[in-house]
């Protein structure tokens, strides 16, 4: 049986990891052993933060909608309640965008929500 030498595979594996670690500080981008740990940890952070990003953006949208609603004399929760009662189904991302860039349209939405609450 022929002897199996794994130099080629090891070299490929090392290159793949070091390529992913490019731009890391110090030994993290140069030493394979350290780079493996850095790349693994980076993957864990990326996985976690892809989920956290959704929460973060939702919080941002709510803050923006709340600010716009309060400028028109309504709290966020009452505004959302009024929108649901008026059967206006616009998601928070779009509402936040309208609140930021189109004040007149947002004011009209707030007025419709107020009318439903009254």
From Swiss-Prot:
One GO cellular component assignment for this chain's record is:
ribonucleoprotein complex
- PROSITE patterns according to UniProt: RIBOSOMAL_L20 (PS00937)
> Which BP terms does GO give this entry?
ribosomal large subunit assembly; translation
Q: Which InterPro entries match?
A: Ribosomal_bL20 (IPR005813), RIBOSOMAL_L20_CS (IPR049946), Ribosomal_protein_bL20_C (IPR035566)
Q: Which UniProt keywords apply?
A: Ribonucleoprotein, Ribosomal protein, RNA-binding, rRNA-binding
User: Zinc-finger among the record's keywords?
Assistant: no
A Gene Ontology molecular function term for this protein is: rRNA binding
Provide the family line. Answer: Belongs to the bacterial ribosomal protein bL20 family.
The record's section on NCBIfam families has: rplT_bact (TIGR01032)
Q: Its biological function?
A: Binds directly to 23S ribosomal RNA and is necessary for the in vitro assembly process of the 50S ribosomal subunit. It is not involved in the protein synthesizing functions of that subunit.
Name this protein carries in UniProt? Large ribosomal subunit protein bL20
Q: What is the gene name?
A: rplT
